[in-house]
Amino acid sequence: MYSLIEDIKKLLSVMLPILVAQISTAGITFINTTMAGHAGSDDLAGVSVGAGLFYPLLASIVGLLMAGTPLMATLLGEKKPEGLPYVVRAGLLIGLVIFFLFGAAYVLFIDDLLTSLTLEAEVAYVARYYLMTMVGVVFFISMIVPLRCLTDTAGSTSTSMKLFLMAPPVNAVFNYLFIYGHFGLPRLGGIGAGLATMLTYGFLLALFLIVVLKSSALKGHEIFHSILVKRSDVKEYLIVGVPSGLSIFMEMSLFSLIIVFLARYGTDTLAAYQIADNFASLVYMLPVSCSMALTILIATAVGAHDIPLARRYKKAGFVVALSGAAMTAAMTVLFRSSIGNMYTSDAIVASIAGQFLIYSAGWQLFDAISTPIQGILRGLKDTRVSFVLMVIAYWGGCFPMSLFLDHVVGLGADSYWLGLVFGVGCSAMLMILRLVYVERVMDREALPAFAFFMHRKITHPAAVHAVVASNVKQAKELLAFWERAEEKLASLVQDIKEAEVDIFTENRRVLPIGLSLLTDLHLCILGHATRAYIP
């Protein structure tokens, strides 16, 4: 007889190493932007622009490739480890395709993209070659993620943690060499930060290859002994991964768009939003790590056809996520003034940020429900409907509500935080409904998605058609909304342009943080980077 405490301990043993790895990755981003800032304002601006364009795409790529986790965990639960090499090779193949597509997009569109941003020549130069180094980063990360999925499932999440803990100091050394040009190397400034990132992930890939090849449990030699890839594995990888990647991209795009609408309220409000966003994103690592751990545990349990065990892990996940959110939300509210003062010495900005942090506390509580459920559903390979629900919650709920509160009710900048809380709340509600539906149908042994992936056949075609028809109807309603909102949106964008607020020029505010200087946009980039599912 297992107790809830034992299930929580098992969950934490998987979750905490993932959390440490997430923090290590955020450390790479922080080191890059901080050291680039000391190289000069043009270098920092170029890195900020390049990172702002790149990280939403990278997060989506990682979200897609992390689909290997439930696929491999399910195989292990089914006691079919011989299938692991095929899934890993499928992930590596998809990663290679993504790399070539990203490289081609860079060559074809980089000139037009930078021209459309109307950047200063020095900033555009740094951004161009920073993004060139990111092509290499895409290759290395696309190779790392499938291997990480393997080590997390067939090995231990502590393996990834140990490897990622090596990354920040290695990255700092490379930054020191290439940004500032020490030991006879050329001084590359912000471009050096990109080169350092690429070399750091290359170093990580080498470490992962060594670990995988040395472990018989990870079947490293079997993975690279053949290049055979099963079409069914590639198809399943994409079916599970594409909705996850798109969900991340849609979410991050919304946060980026909100910055544009907040720009008309002035630099103080924009800076305060980005402080609150950055802090909330750091806190968000907790439910994300819980979600990733739940994916591994539940996929393994489902693969073993142990549904009661999967339900126990679900319960443990909610206890951990909600307990953590209650603590972080309480600390956010109680210490909001201190948090704002940690980011900036500007009293006005800190005061506005304190108000925004109150809203972020509500956001944290809803996230503690929504994010773990996403991990549970991912463990069941149920991602397509979850993606539709995410789009409805954020783009059909959060964004329209923000515009309504701002332009109809007149709540000003607070409208966008209230809209975010509303959107995350809608996401939590929809995810609960989806999970309840999934569990009920599993009880009847007729879950369409579950039956399709676990048994390779559809037991109830009528149920599948009903779900598809419902999703199509919701998508049509969402498109209709966008058509109605198009004129209003164009008008708002024009108002912002007329206000002459440009977050990409040197007129942006610079916030002193400790011994470093972070710009408004810098803080935003850090927030987006830590929110991402980057390995």
Regions found by a protein language model. Name each.
Residues 65, 134-152, 160-171, 193-208, ...:
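Short runs within selected transmembrane alpha-helices of multi-pass transporters and secretion channels
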Residues 23, 27-45, 114-121, 177-188, ...:
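Helix-terminus/linker motif at the lipid-water interface of multi-pass membrane proteins
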Residues 13-29, 133, 167, 200-204, ...:
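Transmembrane helical elements of multi-pass membrane transporters/channels
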Residues 36-55, 87, 122-126, 190-191, ...:
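Interfacial/gating helices of multi-pass transporter permease domains
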Residues 44-104, 141-160, 259, 270-336, ...:
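Small-residue-rich hydrophobic transmembrane alpha-helices
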Residues 1-18, 72-139, 185-242, 298-363, ...:
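Short alpha-helical transmembrane segments in multi-pass integral membrane proteins
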Residues 448-535:
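A detector of single, family-specific signature residues
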Residues 6-34, 38-39, 52-71, 96-103, ...:
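N-terminal transmembrane alpha-helices
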